């Protein structure tokens, strides 16, 4: 017999029903979120590891294909530091924030709005996601003012205003805006803006259904367990009792400021978990912590 063009299933292997269960579990979420806006802050290891970068692009593309409007705001601090080093520029941080002079802001623009942004766009487009790379300077998207400690940090800004019409124009056209967090003021001074802060401001301005932070943190930890859901009252109590400490405090405070601004839910997930984005959005258990204003009970996973 000539070589067969048919193909057998592997001996002893039967289709795994768990895959079907996962797909069915996702269906009500797909219906619920169709036409809604998700703002995703993309950072951490998920931006550095090649496998995780491709998985993120696939996940984002799938969200868009099922009718969710996706807006991405990305970081890129490591890339900025590497470029600065190559150019012989000194990198200085004060309380974890980059001191940004005129030379450094040029590096920020070149790196964030250049290679970092375009690499993300390319990966998403290779999966058919129709991404477009922009910065806060495009179409007057992000108006900024100097940060409170600008005398020390230099050209580090905070968001004053978001041009939602431009973002809506892109998402309504089926595109995925990938935004470099740079803004400028009325005197055309350009500012480096913290990506977390920019994502939160954009989510509030768009009245997004979700703001999702992708980082290297599993979620909000209480003892040796991760909170699946945390409500505002419990968060305040955990901070007061010293259960939530350190760098998690500003994350929690920012999350509830965002919810107070009209965003539906805020999520904190670990981008090192394979398909963390889809698991958080489309499964009952999720993988990280979701912040809500009120919940019937505290759920620990």
UniProtKB/Swiss-Prot annotation:
Pathway: Amino-acid biosynthesis; L-arginine biosynthesis; N(2)-acetyl-L-ornithine from L-glutamate: step 2/4. GO terms for molecular function: acetylglutamate kinase activity; ATP binding. The keyword Kinase applies. Keywords: Amino-acid biosynthesis, Arginine biosynthesis, ATP-binding, Cytoplasm, Kinase, Nucleotide-binding, Transferase. Substrate binds at residues 76-77, 98, 192. Pfam families: AA_kinase (PF00696). One of its GO terms (cellular component) is cytoplasm. Its EC number is 2.7.2.8. It is an enzyme of class 2 (transferase). It is found in: Cytoplasm. HAMAP family: ArgB (MF_00082). Belongs to the acetylglutamate kinase family. ArgB subfamily. This is Acetylglutamate kinase.
